[in-house]
């Protein structure tokens, strides 16, 4: 795995996007002396390709400016979270090549968040509200109509503090009370109409057990966690732009830098004291055609068994993309290529595929395989003919060395490389025609062997003995070159041909009463059984190859072994997708 270091990042050409420009100005003006970012996923599912953009930005910015990035599990909704998701998140971030300076959890700060809430109550900035969720929505108003104050808005700080402590003690059932910020029920920003800061939820937490029957809401916990950790720049996607005034409200009214006593529970646990006044900056989220990235929809695909799990190679989770054969370098190149802006746009899926092709073309060794094999018998060679040919592992990179490839009288070739009635422009095998066998010489087809039903079962041909590599006849011009695998030495392999999961560009388009389920591509996975040269079988899982003339393939992360090779097609050699 390639790892991104501060030195590596600083050696790259200077990036000019608006976020980095803001950071440069903050450093130049002395607003900050160092940069501290964070990546704060909720451990309630697997990361997807959209998260890769945030990861590369959060960690990349920190590395470029010699700073740090914290990985924080935003674990404030325990009913939907799982330690397995938290472990997968750490694995995915590491796989992408990034390393966090600290692993934190919002639950690490529950005591501090509780004390901060008590401070807001004492300052008259928060109150306990008895409205249920439906009533809260009714009182909140609309975009064109101001909200109404809760009947409980004017409770005294003492009464609110007593009720909040009873909430903390577990006295009240779920949903009966919330702690709300006291801001402005007439605000044009609905997020500022007395948003909830805490709700009652008697649910066991993966880290704190049953200690807490109340949990902080996202906006409150997120803002203060940033401040607690000393985050300087809190990078979020555009949907949080309207939440920024609430983010700032929480930070400014709790004011941790001037109320350091609130941090005592952390200091007692050995956490550093590093509160800050972070700045939230929003950027556009990643949208790609032919995909859905809603966690709810991805979960439905798995739960309804429309795919084969979260790491199905057709999924857009990082686990799925990794199993498909996407590399960390290709993912980082993709994020770099699409750039950072505030403008929402839809990226064509081919951009992602081209980044993978570009990376694998450089690093992937070449091998020969047939996915629709047909026998070719070179009848002018002895039946026991066998030799070892020397092939380069990579035609553009001598440092990858060479390999031996067995060659014999009987070969497997690709069925699609022969045509009895060839179309115009055909350059491969035809009856009586010639073709170059990669690295072995020029062959002519003399006979087409068919079974009783008239199906072709083999070709018989002749190998020009003067056209072998190094001989004068090897320079004779023929129209086409095909790959092959020596039949006696071939290793049978399961080859999974993956394609895009959806057949239309906008599977989220619910027109005509259809949903994304109606646009699943029936050809997104085909399993064939072919043959590979021995050098392709003897390799570890997650090893990428270019199967010559076929595409880029990777040994399956879970199912491959040398005795039962399993290859996943990562991407074709060129973009052949038919657009609408």
UniProtKB/Swiss-Prot annotation:
Catalytic reaction(s) noted:
tRNA(Gln) + L-glutamine + ATP = L-glutaminyl-tRNA(Gln) + AMP + diphosphate
Q: Which residues form a coiled coil?
A: none
Recorded hits in Pfam families, A to Z, give:
tRNA-synt_1c (PF00749), tRNA-synt_1c_C (PF03950), tRNA-synt_1c_C2 (PF20974)
Primary site of residence:
cytoplasm
In the UniProt record, which is one GO cellular component term?
Answer: cytosol
Name the EC number(s): 6.1.1.18
What's its top-level EC category? ligase
Where's the motif 'KMSKS' region?
A: 292-296
User: Where does the protein end up?
Assistant: Cytoplasm
Q: Which UniProt keywords apply?
A: Aminoacyl-tRNA synthetase, ATP-binding, Cytoplasm, Ligase, Nucleotide-binding, Protein biosynthesis
Q: Which residues cross the membrane?
A: none
Please list the residues that bind L-glutamine.
74, 218
SUPFAM superfamilies in the record, alphabetically? Answer: Nucleotidylyl transferase (SSF52374), Ribosomal protein L25-like (SSF50715)
What residues bind ATP, as annotated? Answer: 42-44, 48-54, 237, 285-286, 293-295
Which terms does the record give in the GO molecular function aspect?
ATP binding; glutamine-tRNA ligase activity
For biological process, the GO terms are: glutaminyl-tRNA aminoacylation; glutamyl-tRNA aminoacylation
What stretch of residues is annotated with the motif 'HIGH' region?
A: 41-51
Q: Which family does it belong to?
A: Belongs to the class-I aminoacyl-tRNA synthetase family.
The UniProt subunit note reads as follows: Monomer.
Q: Which NCBIfam families match?
A: glnS (TIGR00440), PRK14703.1 (NF011291)
Q: What is this protein called?
A: Glutamine--tRNA ligase
Q: What is the lineage of its organism?
A: Bacteria, Pseudomonadati, Pseudomonadota, Gammaproteobacteria, Lysobacterales
């Amino acid at each position: 795995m390639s790892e991104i270091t501060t030195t590596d990042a600083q050696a790259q050409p200077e990036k000019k996007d608006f976020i980095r420009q803001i950071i440069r100005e903050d450093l130049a003006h002395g607003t900050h002396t160092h940069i501290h970012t964070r990546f704060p996923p909720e451990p309630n599912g697997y990361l997807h390709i959209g998260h890769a953009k945030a990861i590369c930005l959060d960690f990349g910015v920190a590395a470029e400016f010699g700073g740090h990035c914290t990985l924080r599990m935003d674990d404030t909704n325990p009913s939907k979270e799982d330690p397995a998701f938290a472990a997968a998140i750490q694995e995915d971030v590491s796989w992408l090549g990034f390393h966090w300076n600290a692993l934190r959890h919002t639950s690490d700060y529950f005591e501090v968040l509780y004390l901060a809430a008590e401070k807001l109550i004492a300052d008259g900035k928060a109150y306990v509200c008895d409205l249920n969720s439906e009533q809260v929505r009714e009182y909140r108003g609309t975009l064109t109509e101001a909200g109404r104050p809760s009947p409980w808005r004017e409770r005294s700080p003492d009464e609110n503090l007593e009720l909040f402590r009873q909430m903390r003690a577990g006295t009240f059932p779920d949903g009966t009370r919330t702690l709300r910020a006291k801001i402005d029920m007439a605000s044009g920003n609905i997020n500022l109409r007395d948003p909830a800061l805490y709700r009652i939820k008697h649910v066991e937490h993966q880290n704190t057990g049953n200690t807490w029957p109340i949990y902080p809401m996202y906006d409150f916990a997120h803002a203060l966690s940033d401040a607690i950790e000393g985050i300087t720049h809190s990078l979020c996607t555009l949907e949080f732009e309207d939440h920024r005034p609430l983010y700032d409200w929480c930070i400014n009214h709790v004011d941790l830098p001037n109320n350091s006593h609130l941090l005592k529970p952390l200091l007692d646990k050995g956490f550093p004291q590093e509160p800050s006044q972070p700045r939230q900056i929003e950027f556009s989220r990643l949208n790609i055609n032919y995909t859905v990235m809603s966690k709810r929809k991805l979960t439905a695909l798995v739960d309804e068994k429309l795919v084969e799990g979260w790491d199905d190679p057709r999924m857009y989770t990082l686990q799925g993309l990794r199993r498909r054969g996407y590399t960390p370098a290709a993912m980082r190149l993709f994020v770099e290529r699409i750039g950072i802006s505030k403008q929402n746009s839809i990226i064509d899926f081919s951009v992602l595929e081209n980044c993978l092709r570009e990376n694998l073309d450089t690093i992937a060794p070449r091998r020969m395989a047939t996915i629709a094999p047909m026998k070719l018998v070179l009848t002018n060679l002895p039946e026991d003919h066998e030799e070892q040919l020397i092939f380069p592992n990579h035609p553009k990179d001598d440092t990858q060395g060479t390999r031996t490839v067995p060659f014999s009288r009987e070969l497997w070739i690709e069925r699609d490389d022969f045509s009895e009635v060839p179309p115009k422009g055909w350059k491969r095998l035809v009856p009586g025609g010639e073709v170059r066998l990669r690295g072995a010489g020029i062959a002519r087809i003399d006979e087409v062997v068919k079974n009783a039903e008239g199906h072709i079962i083999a070709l018989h041909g002749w190998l020009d003995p003067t056209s072998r590599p190094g001989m004068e006849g090897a320079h004779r011009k023929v129209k086409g070159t095909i790959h092959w695998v020596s039949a006696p030495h071939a290793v049978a392999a399961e080859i999974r041909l993956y394609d895009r999961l959806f057949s239309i560009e906008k599977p989220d388009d619910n027109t005509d009463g259809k949903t994304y389920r109606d646009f699943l591509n029936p050809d997104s996975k085909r399993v064939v059984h072919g043959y590979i040269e021995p050098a392709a079988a003897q390799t570890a899982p997650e090893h990428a190859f270019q199967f010559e003339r076929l595409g880029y393939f990777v040994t399956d992360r879970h199912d491959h072994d040398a005795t039962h090779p399993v290859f996943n097609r990562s991407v074709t050699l060129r973009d052949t997708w038919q657009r609408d």
